[in-house]
Design a protein with these regions (language model features):
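Conserved Radical SAM active-site core
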Residues: 1-148, 156-158, 180, 367-415
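Generic serine detector
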Residues: 8, 12, 19, 28-31, ...
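Functionally constrained cores in energy, signaling, and assembly domains
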Residues: 17, 26, 174, 187-189, ...
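A broad, structural surface signal
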Residues: 32-35, 39, 113, 210, ...
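A generic membrane alpha-helix/interface feature
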Residues: 49-51, 212, 234, 303
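C-terminal accessory extensions appended to soluble enzyme cores
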Residues: 235-415
Length: 415
């Protein structure tokens, strides 16, 4: 029997490297149809495939969410400590909370009223624009200085955007919305130039950054497009990508990636683009952040989604460790362990809500660990894919152990 309500929040699968690992979605589906959407690849396989592809949708239970945040000790479960510590919650991970479903159902609006009442810090990720012209929403947003809004825009090319981002307002409309938020005296507007796609983003990316800055964006976050070559959904979209990019995208990624399966372009390909972005952000007065594992050391601080260092995000993650090492040359486990132990030390890895624990090998290895134990294991096993060493491809180097046998990492990148 299908569940009446969608179950959210969940833990991000990038928990080891995420400043907002508690991520929330209003709906089980998204009315937008972006060809690059990783959620589409993730949800469009296995048992949920039919309901996702047919755009069947369920919303969260507003009453359940209110109980979680009103009495976290009783109703918060694994998220109780995160809520009690009032860490920033990421809203909009797998779906857009301001999409067409919200326009007809209004579940996000109900929750916004509640979160404003309790003054809870939030970071939104969206491509929608209509809510910035709706007084019901803007009356709640105005003056709410602990609500930050990220607007995803990957190109100024209206035609390419229309083809790739089906059902999404034009880049200009999104810039207009960003400007309305920037002028609302809230927690800031951020340009989310993700995913950055060579051939689609490259012709206009510097103009896009300048335009966002002129509209009031105070930060930008970026990440290169990754190709999941095992995804049948993405394979079906490849002819469209090839036409828009002007080259064989899959062949390009296979040639310039060092991995197989999930293809990420190598550092040399990305370097000139990231350096151009950072230089321009410094010129126009925007903070710069890289969510990509490559060149994350260029971030202004330890929240790669673009939150300033004054915000109450989790410091228990590798991006923070990278910033510490960049400043002090070395970083130690005790430098980041407090938030890890407080926020994710109270539940077992195997039971982490929304986290990928399906691998039999991982189950056997981590079955008895808490999530905090798992993160410490990653820290101390540099050959693991999510270790600081492997994730950043040697920018953090293990150089020894402390008195507790935890690895010490040294910064190995540009200052």
């Amino acid at each position: 029997m299908p569940q009446k309500y969608y179950q959210s929040p969940r833990w991000s699968n990038e928990i080891a490297d995420c400043s907002m690992p508690m991520t929330f979605d209003t709906y089980s589906n998204c009315s937008f149809g972006c060809l690059y959407c990783f959620s589409q690849f993730q949800r469009g396989i296995g048992n949920p495939k039919e309901t996702y592809l047919h755009k069947d949708v369920r919303g969260v239970s507003v009453d359940r969410v209110k109980k979680m945040f009103t009495d976290p000790d009783k109703y918060g479960g694994q998220f109780a400590e995160y809520i009690k510590q009032r860490k920033v919650m990421q809203w909009g991970g797998l779906s857009d909370q301001f999409d067409g479903f919200e326009r007809t159902r209004g579940v996000t609006l109900e929750l916004l009223r509640f979160f404003k009442e309790i003054n809870y810090p939030l970071c939104f990720s969206t491509k929608a624009t209509w809510f910035t012209k709706d007084d019901r929403y803007m009356d709640l947003i105005r003056g709410q200085r602990n609500w930050n809004f990220k607007f995803s825009i990957i190109t100024l090319d209206e035609q390419k955007a229309h083809i790739i981002e089906k059902g999404v307002p034009s880049p200009k409309e999104r810039l207009d919305a960003l400007e309305r938020i920037a002028n609302a005296d809230a927690g800031g507007a951020t340009l989310r130039l993700r995913p950055f796609i060579i051939g689609v983003s490259t012709p206009t990316y510097l103009d896009l950054i300048r335009e966002a800055a002129s509209r009031g964006a105070t930060a930008m976050s970026t990440e290169f497009f990754c190709v999941e070559q095992r995804s049948p959904t993405l394979k079906a979209f490849m002819p469209t990508f090839n036409e828009l990019c002007g080259f064989d995208v899959m062949a390009f990624y296979r040639k310039y990636s060092i991995s197989s399966g999930y293809l990420r372009l190598n550092r040399k390909v990305k370097e000139p683009f990231f350096k151009n972005m950072k230089a321009l952000c410094e010129e126009v007065g925007m903070r710069f952040y890289v969510s990509d594992a490559h060149f994350k050391e260029l971030c202004c601080n330890g929240s790669c989604c673009g939150l300033p260092s004054s915000w109450n995000y989790s410091r228990g993650q590798w991006c923070e460790a990278l910033q510490i090492a960049k400043e002090k040359e070395f970083v130690y486990w005790p430098d980041i362990k407090d938030d890890i132990e407080k926020l994710v030390g109270g539940f077992e890895w195997i039971r982490a809500i929304g986290f990928n624990t399906n691998s039999s090998e991982k189950k056997a290895k981590f079955d008895t660990m808490t999530m905090a134990d798992y993160m410490r294991w990653l820290w101390n096993n540099p050959q693991a894919g999510q270790s600081p060493y492997k994730l950043f491809e040697g920018i953090l180097l293990p150089v020894g152990k402390d008195e507790n046998e935890d690895l010490i990492y040294k910064y190995n990148g540009h200052k």
